């Protein structure tokens, strides 16, 4: 990756890290000992039609597919698989067909919370179509996996979703697609992994760690298919990956802004993830911590020896000023201008 791209990612990290400070409640789910087949059953589907904003999609839905033999939690270790109905009539969509269509692989993870498999519908605004709907309308096959998260517990109170559970689950879902590639629509050699924030981080990790042996032990434990877990493309929005340094970056960027509006992520009694906003003012101790974290960031940033597209070294002085700050500012201004021009 070029250095200027690293800069863009770093800026995204500092903007997105606030999500990780959200309060949470734990969910308790039962551990299952039932063994499942990981052979794709093409007979279990429903043909569905959905219209949003005047666009209609007809698709075949294979839902709640358990993608491992020995799941820890079948509420999350499942996948929904959607295929444009046109492919079963020998037709093409957007130049793709039943055999070569890319597989859009969007996870629903946010805040490293557990996530159920997604479905086509409206986005959070309740008006516009979500990414799964759009992908199907463009001829993509969609495989939306669920995954365990940091608050998931079994009936005995044991946490079953702590790291590396989420990435292991997503890898297992990818392996399912490769394992069944000959009998499933779409091409497992053209998987496009997608996610936002923590989901973006997991998507990035999928792309960077394809077929890495470090995960074999965990994949074997849950009965993942003996197949590749590599993806072709990663689509990651504000991926929060650099966790050990993200707080410093965040406070460097927002230090001095002491009124806040933060996102609180909780889980209701029916296990649905709920997101609400909380407003307030920072305490004296919080302001002190912010100042200390901001002061730590320049040393870390300078140690990276990052460069812009012209080869200029980007750095900060002890006060947090310098051409790196100007570099980040230019991206923020350009982004704001683009939004204003729409």
Predicted regions, residues:
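Bacterial N-terminal signal peptides
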Residues: 10-18
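Alpha/beta-hydrolase active-site loop
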Residues: 159-183
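Cap/lid segment of the alpha/beta-hydrolase catalytic domain
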Residues: 106-168, 207-209
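Catalytic-loop region of hydrolases
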Residues: 24-97
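Bacterial N-terminal signal peptides that target proteins for export
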Residues: 1-9
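Primarily recognizes the serine-hydrolase "nucleophile elbow" in alpha/beta-hydrolase
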Residues: 179-256
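Short beta-strand element of the alpha/beta-hydrolase
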Residues: 79, 93-112, 116
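Non-catalytic, alpha-helical, charged scaffold/linker segments
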Residues: 237-239, 245-342
